[in-house]
């Protein structure tokens, strides 16, 4: 996979892209990450990438020319049209399902904005997706693009050493992940549940499944709204409700 990030602040990505999973993914050649300063594409004699909004108002608006030119340059040798994703608080809420969808693409371009916003022609004629990572305000789209990049890249084949850990992650199964414990079995009187030390894998799997359901019901009940619960999950959920 190829991921290009269009930004005015490329230095922000050095630490994130040069460590942990993203670093390993690049070393394994599972992904090619490029950070591009779209100011390099401006034709303005003052090297500017923004201007005052027509009709007046506060703030500056990113002009279309440098962003259009940057995307066109990055895709001039690409046979398949890439997904061009605008980081935008008005966009579709980012979810695990969206991450899985994007992980199936060959080429992604993330556009990170600043200032008051983007010229609307960028939205209408250039991008394929607009994505938001939450209902809050950030200084720019850089942090959002880092979050999405990490979420997508870890899904690529061969990136994670243990495929099972990826499958069991919160949201991957539609439920929040079950609790985890490690040594010691008794820490200051706080004990690990007996079932986890029983060696009975069937009972352990059932405990983890039920605890995932419990945690989801308690912390994110909205995730259960569209879930087609199995007969066993319905039984467990009734037990969980009685235990509350």
From Swiss-Prot:
InterPro entries with a match to the protein in the record: Alpha/beta_knot_MTases, tRNA_m1G_MeTrfase_C_sf, tRNA_m1G_MeTrfase_TrmD, tRNA_m1G_MTases_N, tRNA_MeTrfase_TRMD/TRM10
Reaction(s) the record says it catalyses: guanosine(37) in tRNA + S-adenosyl-L-methionine = N(1)-methylguanosine(37) in tRNA + S-adenosyl-L-homocysteine + H(+)
Domain of life: Bacteria
TM region(s), chain numbering: none
Similarity annotation: Belongs to the RNA methyltransferase TrmD family.
PANTHER family linked to this entry: TRNA (GUANINE-N(1)-)-METHYLTRANSFERASE
Task performed by this protein: Specifically methylates guanosine-37 in various tRNAs.
Stated name of the protein: tRNA (guanine-N(1)-)-methyltransferase
Organism field: Bacillus cereus (strain G9842)
Taxonomic lineage of the native organism: Bacteria, Bacillati, Bacillota, Bacilli, Bacillales
Record gene name: trmD
């Amino acid at each position: 996979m190829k991921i290009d990030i269009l930004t005015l602040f490329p230095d922000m990505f050095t630490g994130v892209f040069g460590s942990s999973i993203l670093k390993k993914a690049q070393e394994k050649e599972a992904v090619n990450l490029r950070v591009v300063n779209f100011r390099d594409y401006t034709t303005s004699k003052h090297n500017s990438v923004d201007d005052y909004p027509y009709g007046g108002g506060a703030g500056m608006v990113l002009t279309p020319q440098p962003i259009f030119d940057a995307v066109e340059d990055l895709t001039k040798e690409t046979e398949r049209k890439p997904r061009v994703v605008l980081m935008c608080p008005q966009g579709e809420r980012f979810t695990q399902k969206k991450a899985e969808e994007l992980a199936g693409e060959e080429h992604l371009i993330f556009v990170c904005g600043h200032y008051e916003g983007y010229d609307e022609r960028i939205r209408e004629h250039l991008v394929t997706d607009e994505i938001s990572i939450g209902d809050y305000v950030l200084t720019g789209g850089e942090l959002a693009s880092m979050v999405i990049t990490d979420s997508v890249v870890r899904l690529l084949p061969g990136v994670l050493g243990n495929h099972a850990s990826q499958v069991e992650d919160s949201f991957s199964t539609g439920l929040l992940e079950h609790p985890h414990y490690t040594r010691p079995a008794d820490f200051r009187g706080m004990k690990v549940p007996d079932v986890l030390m029983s060696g009975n894998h069937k009972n352990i799997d059932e405990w983890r499944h039920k605890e995932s359901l419990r945690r989801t019901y308690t912390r994110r009940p909205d995730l259960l709204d569209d879930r087609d619960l199995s007969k066993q999950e319905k039984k467990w959920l009734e037990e969980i409700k009685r235990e509350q």
